[in-house]
């Protein structure tokens, strides 16, 4: 038995009532910038690793 659409809507409504839309919006933007920073650091690490490997050979 999974969670139905109605149950998800009720949970979403309760979360919005508890935290408010402004706080949730701020949390979403903070999470998005954290994910972008993580992706950038991973891609920078791969670039550095590839540059080190090519300089060694």
Swiss-Prot record:
GO CC terms of this entry: TAT protein transport complex
UniProt keyword annotation of Nucleus present: no
GO biological process: protein transport by the Tat complex
Chief location: membrane
InterPro entries: TatA/B/E, TatA/E
Membrane topology note: Single-pass membrane protein
Pfam families (alphabetical): TatA_B_E
Keywords of the record: Cell inner membrane, Cell membrane, Membrane, Protein transport, Translocation, Transmembrane, Transmembrane helix, Transport
Coiled coil residues, start to end: none
Parts of the chain that traverse the membrane: 1-21
Record's compositionally biased regions (Polar residues): 44-57
Molecular-function GO terms, alphabetical: protein transmembrane transporter activity
Stretches the record annotates as Disordered: 37-57
Keyword Kinase: no
Annotated localization: Cell inner membrane
Complex and partners: The Tat system comprises two distinct complexes: a TatABC complex, containing multiple copies of TatA, TatB and TatC subunits, and a separate TatA complex, containing only TatA subunits. Substrates initially bind to the TatABC complex, which probably triggers association of the separate TatA complex to form the active translocon.
Function: Part of the twin-arginine translocation (Tat) system that transports large folded proteins containing a characteristic twin-arginine motif in their signal peptide across membranes. TatA could form the protein-conducting channel of the Tat system.
Family to which the UniProt record says this protein belongs: Belongs to the TatA/E family.
Identification of the protein by name: Sec-independent protein translocase protein TatA
Organism this protein belongs to: Stutzerimonas stutzeri
């Amino acid at each position: 038995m999974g969670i139905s659409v109605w149950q998800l809507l009720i949970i979403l409504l309760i979360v919005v009532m508890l935290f408010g839309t402004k706080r949730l919006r701020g949390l979403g933007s903070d999470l998005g910038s954290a994910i972008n920073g993580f992706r950038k650091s991973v891609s920078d690490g791969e670039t550095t690793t590839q540059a080190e490997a090519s300089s060694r050979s």
